[in-house]
């Protein structure tokens, strides 16, 4: 998707990909057999335009489909996780390259409903040619596909997610902006309130389930 605080498309050179560059999406897609991600609630502080950083709280509602597991992994690239809560309980986690591994407080049960809260922040990533999050031309905007990145899904550069073409979820976006920038986003605007000075908080709801690269 192309949204957030404005939208511009850049014409960029293409890059030929070799056969050996192909990436096996099987393990990523297989997660959707074990977990059903229902909803993402994303609280994003996008007020640091000049520092080109963001702070986020992702609240993720999901259902366990296959019990017995004690850990699960999410896609998250470039950004650093501060803490994770599982149904309100702080849990251990680790980050390895573009994966966030979260330890469940107890073996998971089939049918269990979980609210996962992830606090994170840093400088969001982008593709060398086209895609990802940009701070440019007095805008902050996101392009959901990395043109030369394998795999190409780019939800993971701005929030923890199941970043594949199979999993679909609904979304709530809560975007904090400043310096005259106003959010333009997926879904419909619920409210926009002033937090003092030139800082705004806008809330958007998207009730139609979509994959991460469109979010």
What are the language-model segments listed below?
Residues 1-215:
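Acidic/His-enriched low-complexity segments
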